[in-house]
């Protein structure tokens, strides 16, 4: 019997970086949690809260998932052993998960986008999203929907406030 997937967000997770533009530019279909292979100075830099997922994306090469364009600045106490800030980093997932993702990406014209980078139990994890790119009209519709929802909640707040006064 297969194990149930763990919830990605736990209360004891220390979030290092989030990719806020990903939710604006993509329709998120599914999320996955993956480990990441890092050097020691990268982990130390992440513990200082320094990272940027702004232009990051994941690719599948030879059955392995690689995170590209993740910017982790050099550790300021590091010496000649410091890492390259934008090097490609290998993501750690089970073979079945990788094969499943490859099939979905190939069939549905989808992409893998990192949503957040966080520590859980002393290990660095990446929340990956299987996503489809939004077009300009989709973004406008989402913005209009959010504005309408905000207006409804504002009006409800006014009515409740008027009843209690």
Curated annotation (Swiss-Prot):
Coiled coil (UniProt feature): none
Cysteine pairings via disulfide bonds: none
Composition bias type Basic and acidic residues, residue spans: 135-158
Example GO molecular function: RNA binding
Gene Ontology process terms (BP): trans-translation
Residue stretches spanning the membrane: none
Annotated segments matching region Disordered: 135-165
Database matches in PROSITE patterns: SSRP
One Gene Ontology cellular component annotation held by this UniProt entry: cytosol
Source taxon at top rank: Bacteria
Keyword set includes RNA-binding: yes
Pfam families, per database record: SmpB
UniProt record similarity statement: Belongs to the SmpB family.
Function: Required for rescue of stalled ribosomes mediated by trans-translation. Binds to transfer-messenger RNA (tmRNA), required for stable association of tmRNA with ribosomes. tmRNA and SmpB together mimic tRNA shape, replacing the anticodon stem-loop with SmpB. tmRNA is encoded by the ssrA gene; the 2 termini fold to resemble tRNA(Ala) and it encodes a 'tag peptide', a short internal open reading frame. During trans-translation Ala-aminoacylated tmRNA acts like a tRNA, entering the A-site of stalled ribosomes, displacing the stalled mRNA.
Matching HAMAP family: SmpB (MF_00023)
Name of the protein described by the UniProt record: SsrA-binding protein
Top-level taxonomy: Bacteria, Bacillati, Actinomycetota, Actinomycetes, Mycobacteriales
């Amino acid at each position: 019997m297969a194990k149930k997937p763990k919830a990605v967000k736990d209360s004891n997770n220390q979030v290092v970086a989030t990719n806020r533009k990903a939710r604006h530019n993509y329709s998120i279909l599914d999320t996955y949690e993956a480990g990441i292979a890092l050097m020691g100075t990268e982990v130390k830099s992440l513990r200082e809260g320094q990272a940027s997922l702004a232009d990051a994306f994941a690719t599948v090469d030879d059955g392995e998932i690689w995170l590209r364009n993740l910017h982790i600045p050099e550790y300021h106490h590091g010496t000649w052993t410091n890492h390259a800030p934008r090097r490609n980093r290998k993501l750690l997932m089970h073979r079945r998960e990788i094969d499943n993702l490859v099939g979905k990406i190939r069939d549905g014209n989808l992409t893998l986008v990192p949503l957040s980078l966080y520590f859980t139990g002393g290990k660095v994890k990446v929340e990956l999203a299987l996503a489809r790119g939004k077009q300009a009209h989709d973004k406008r519709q989402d913005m209009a929907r959010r504005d309408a929802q905000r207006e409804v909640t504002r009006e409800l707040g006014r009515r409740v406030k008027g009843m209690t006064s």
